[in-house]
Design a protein with these regions (language model features):
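Solvent-exposed, non-transmembrane regions of membrane-associated and secreted proteins
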Residues: 2-209
Length: 209
């Protein structure tokens, strides 16, 4: 009986710890997001049409003139905030999420904000990993096909995507996310840490204004 009580107490302590860590991560991300948005706004005097990238730059393939975005440096600009680099922010309206994205990843960074693990939005191979906090990517499994995702880089370029596939993967299946063939991949751990939830996205076709 004593053993059972100890296990229940341990589970309760773990639950409270996780909730505290989740709330703290949410607050930190909100503060950092404000800094990222401020850094982007500081160079917002550029013409809007030179800062938007809502369609895939395939001028030669579709017979049209190459777009201005084709000349972009494939490496995304990085801004330093509180000792860490950031490449922009990701927004998932269906989940009510808007989060800063760090330029590099490790487990310490994942406790703070989502991280760019591989690729670049300018090469259509961006992979963003995040902790399974509710305030980060813990609700990815709730997304539906067709949901919109946007990623805004530090130059203010807005990239708009559509969720095309949602999969549960093995932690060892790195190739599936790193070389998926999709323009954007979002992923996180399942609650038990045994698997990964990944959302594979492609760019949308920009609406004509």
């Amino acid at each position: 009986m004593a053993v059972g009580a100890a296990l229940i107490l341990s589970a309760l302590v773990l639950l409270l710890h996780n909730r505290y860590a989740d709330a703290r991560a949410g607050r930190e991300a909100e503060t950092l997001l404000a800094g990222v948005e401020a850094a982007i706004s500081s160079q917002a005097d550029e013409p809007e049409e030179t800062r938007r990238q809502e369609t895939r730059p395939t001028g030669e393939e579709n017979g049209t003139e190459p777009t201005a975005t084709e000349a972009l440096d494939p490496e995304m600009p990085v801004a330093m905030l509180e000792g860490y680099g950031y490449v922009g922010y990701v927004e998932i309206p269906a989940l009510g999420l808007k989060l800063p994205v760090m330029s590099d990843w490790d487990y310490t960074r994942l406790e703070i904000a989502p991280c760019r693990q591989f690729g670049s939005s300018r090469k259509d191979d961006l992979v963003i990993a995040a902790h399974n906090f509710e305030s980060h990517f813990g609700r990815l499994k709730e997304m539906s096909l067709g949901n919109t995702v946007t990623f805004t880089d530090m130059a203010g370029i807005v990239n708009t995507y559509r969720a095309e596939m949602i999969e549960t993967l093995s932690p060892k299946d790195v190739e599936a996310v790193q070389n998926s063939g999709y323009d954007l991949v979002l992923y996180t751990c399942t609650r038990d840490g045994q698997e990964r939830v990944a959302v594979f996205c492609n760019r949308t076709i920009a609406e004509k204004e």
